[in-house]
Swiss-Prot record:
It comes from Homo sapiens (Human). Pfam families: T-box. Monomer. This is T-box transcription factor T. Residues 279-308 are annotated as: Disordered.
Amino acid sequence: MSSPGTESAGKSLQYRVDHLLSAVENELQAGSEKGDPTERELRVGLEESELWLRFKELTNEMIVTKNGRRMFPVLKVNVSGLDPNAMYSFLLDFVAADNHRWKYVNGEWVPGGKPEPQAPSCVYIHPDSPNFGAHWMKAPVSFSKVKLTNKLNGGGQIMLNSLHKYEPRIHIVRVGGPQRMITSHCFPETQFIAVTAYQNEEITALKIKYNPFAKAFLDAKERSDHKEMMEEPGDSQQPGYSQWGWLLPGTSTLCPPANPHPQFGGALSLPSTHSCDRYPTLRSHRSSPYPSPYAHRNNSPTYSDNSPACLSMLQSHDNWSSLGMPAHPSMLPVSHNASPPTSSSQYPSLWSVSNGAVTPGSQAAAVSNGLGAQFFRGSPAHYTPLTHPVSAPSSSGSPLYEGAAAATDIVDSQYDAAAQGRLIASWTPVSPPSM
């Protein structure tokens, strides 16, 4: 005699089994109304045929990649007339639609030669296979997971030759007994040309319009383009000191002045690794609007951010436009001992200053540096050549005099003695600072 607890447990288990059996029965009945045990009324129709026709009018294209690419539009068919209780498998393959190799010329596809040998026949088996006829008939059969590739790598992918036209075929095979082919169906509107990249822009636009996954890529591209557009104005805006980076390459104009008169050099030479070169990246990533006439060297003199001094140097450059000078204008290095200066400079000197006295350099140095009489006639003022030593200029002296008084053997009637007197009067001795 069974206890009440055992009877209740058996009833609850039966209820659970009945629920499962009922679910299976409902699943089988879902497509049975379209079934035909004789399979005489079997029909296979293409889903979204209007969309396929729009692509066919433009000559549809499908991407093939090494790793495989899914199709769009997705191949879907609706089936009716199968035996609801029989088992079937659905297969898909692709056949050549013609005997041509195609090429895209002047906005249209034209035959481009003989086709390549056909790849080994690849067949895609629908992942729901095998299954009851009722299962296949209850909803459209979608081949959304099939991938097209141009490499023979297996993995259930379909290998196609690029620039060849193909047509998909769907096969229905009855299984679970004597296996036999029931039917094969193909749809001309699903023909396409396999490509590694879309050729027709209209095909690209149509796929983006109707493919929900392509819209995600399009939105990402639009965001990327918008970000680039937002960054471009910031890149094109250059700081106010950028023009000095073009005029004075290899030096930074943001450094504090080491000497109130940088055109005469400094008492202490700074190494090339000085902190003045702390903004090199600003110049390296900025394109110069004009080719720079200066040759960059490591041992370059230090320049201050003294705007009047920079402007005076730029004004003197205006008169050098007609000269093809390979080197820099002369500068005046200062030496506080009898020995010659040891610090190298990218500016060759026409004047040698020793113990506060300025003596004219050799004319050969001027000629070797490309500074002839035409250079001195183009200077802002004209002065007679100096044949005797003069004192170094004071702090109030103009930096323009350094180049104008460098000619030693030039004789010209336009030079007068009054100008020489004014020049000597404005130059005062300079005593070097104690070391």
